[in-house]
Amino acid sequence: MIPEEIRAELQAHARAEAPNEACGLVVLRDGKAERYIPGENAVASPYRFELRTEPENWFLEDEGYELAVFHSHPSSPPKPSRADLERAGLWAARPWLILRTDTRELAAWRLDDGSATPIPLD
């Protein structure tokens, strides 16, 4: 579940980074988002992202949190692109949240072996 205040933060970050993709981490506990940690898109591209975040953010998982990878698609559907599927790497085991910036549509996915499975947001 993604509360409205977290959705608003995702939308604000996506708008601020447009026309490039924004990215960051959503911190979840028991399936509910508790906060958003904005990251930096190291490639500053409207077509792909490389998340740069402080290393200590990854240790939140050791404290019982789940981390979801967030990024925006400036004007394409909120589903994993070919680039997303090809570059999932170590993030494939985590939930992915994708926001279409121009419509504010948000979707969640689980990526595995080059395929994507939708995850309910409620």
Residue ranges, per PLM feature:
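Conserved beta-strand-loop surface patch within small alpha/beta domains used
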Residues: 1-66, 75-122
